[in-house]
Amino acid sequence: SVGFKAGVKDYKLTYYTPDYETKDTDILAAFRVTPQPGVPPEEAGAAVAAESSTGTWTTVWTDGLTSLDRYKGRCYHIEAVVGEDNQYIAYVAYPLDLFEEGSVTNMLTSIVGNVFGFKALRALRLEDLRIPPAYSKTFQGPPHGIQVERDKLNKYGRPLLGCTIKPKLGLSAKNYGRAVYECLRGGLDFTKDDENVNSQPFMRWRDRFVFCAEALYKAQAETGEIKGHYLNATAGTCEEMMKRAVFARELGAPIVMHDYLTGGFTANTSLAHYCRDNGLLLHIHRAMHAVIDRQKNHGMHFRVLAKALRMSGGDHIHGGTVVGKLEGEREITLGFVDLLRDDYIEKDRSRGIFFTQDWVSMPGVIPVASGGIHVWHMPALTEIFGDDSVLQFGGGTLGHPWGNAPGAVANRVALEACVQARNEGRDLAREGNEIIREASKWSPELAAA
């Protein structure tokens, strides 16, 4: 009988299509699939494709009202993971029409919205996404990008230096502003609100913004350099967030900050649009990322969150350090650092990059190295991250035995010494400690650090 038949059927009959030629407009995903015992990998891969696109658990008569061939996700390739028992990489292609233009929120809802709780899978991890130009062009992307930021700040040929103001909670606004001033006066380019500083009883946001702006202008006048403080605009509602961003602009602040995962992509994209329209730089913190990306076999790899952020919009994003207190492997980290900064990134599995990604001149995002780093790490950081980065020393600045400003001086001297040594052709990896020692002869602040 040709007619409609109800009943449960295998996904792989419809959604596993190994001979499919991927289109240039498809969004491609690489999933790490761990099927339940007894579930063949093709069925598991097809189930992922189905549940994250057009499928449901049974045949429904309304399937006849649409063209599945046009709209279904397809699992087009499966490979076993070397060295892992019962783990596979399933490659899925999604037709562009499944996604709303300019909405990271909708893209993630579709691709990772429902399928991660699926019974046939023991675990599932989204390792990488290929965003086609046809889709990325519907996004504004970062408000300004790397070159525009350098021109705004008038700082070239070196990484930028930042510092998170500690203790992160408990300072009054006036004392907070004082710490900001000391760090900037000492030689840092930026200071930063901690990600959990929003507007608490001991320091309301407006007071903090005012004192930080005062610190900025004073440090700028005394050093002749442009300074910034990441004013955290993250709030409980989008309206309140925008209110804070507007106030930052009225104070003449150059940069605001947002926690993009806890704040959400919808809020983040709105803020990014405001920042471009009003000449504010946007610093992005990735609070909550480890909840999503730390498990090796379940969740989402940070490189996906990084790509999503570049589409949603941000000028800086925290991306691990390779050397500090938080986890991050060197090649993998450099992989997503390139995905953030570069225009065109070749597929390279050794760096965790599953697809060639062409951003077609979408502005880049500056990676921020932050967390447990101090002056002895400076040569390594300069070498690993290169010029287009922000190196952030929190305790590494404020923990200086002589105080905040000397701590800032020590960091700036160390950075300038490393950049000069690199430009003279010296090997930072080998001679790093020696370079820092030489510099400390001329800088008592660095010697004390």
Swiss-Prot record:
GO CC annotations, alphabetized: chloroplast
Stored InterPro entries: RuBisCO, RuBisCo_large_chain_AS, RuBisCO_lsu_C, RuBisCO_lsu_C_sf, RuBisCO_lsu_fd_N, RuBisCO_lsu_N_sf, RuBisCO_lsuI
Write out the catalytic residues in the record.
K166 (proton acceptor), H285 (proton acceptor)
Q: Does the keyword Nucleotide-binding apply?
A: no
* Molecular functions per Gene Ontology: magnesium ion binding; monooxygenase activity; ribulose-bisphosphate carboxylase activity
Question: Could you tell me the keywords of this UniProt record?
Answer: Calvin cycle, Carbon dioxide fixation, Chloroplast, Disulfide bond, Lyase, Magnesium, Metal-binding, Methylation, Monooxygenase, Oxidoreductase, Photorespiration, Photosynthesis, Plastid
Q: Where does Mg(2+) bind?
A: K192, D194, E195
Q: Which GO terms describe its biological process?
A: photorespiration; reductive pentose-phosphate cycle
Matching Pfam families: RuBisCO_large, RuBisCO_large_N
Provide the positions where the record notes the PTM N6-carboxylysine: K192
The cofactor(s) it depends on are: Mg(2+)
Cofactor binding annotation: Binds 1 Mg(2+) ion per subunit.
Q: Which Gene3D superfamilies match?
A: Ribulose bisphosphate carboxylase, large subunit, C-terminal domain, RuBisCO large subunit, N-terminal domain
What compartments host this protein? Plastid, Chloroplast
Residues the entry annotates as binding substrate: N114, T164, K168, R286, H318, S370
The protein's PTM annotation reads: The disulfide bond which can form in the large chain dimeric partners within the hexadecamer appears to be associated with oxidative stress and protein turnover.
Q: Which HAMAP family match?
A: RuBisCO_L_type1
The entry's function note states: RuBisCO catalyzes two reactions: the carboxylation of D-ribulose 1,5-bisphosphate, the primary event in carbon dioxide fixation, as well as the oxidative fragmentation of the pentose substrate in the photorespiration process. Both reactions occur simultaneously and in competition at the same active site.
What additional remark is attached to this entry?
A: The basic functional RuBisCO is composed of a large chain homodimer in a 'head-to-tail' conformation. In form I RuBisCO this homodimer is arranged in a barrel-like tetramer with the small subunits forming a tetrameric 'cap' on each end of the 'barrel'.
Family that this chain belongs to: Belongs to the RuBisCO large chain family. Type I subfamily.
User: What is the protein's given name?
Assistant: Ribulose bisphosphate carboxylase large chain
**Gene this protein is translated from:** rbcL
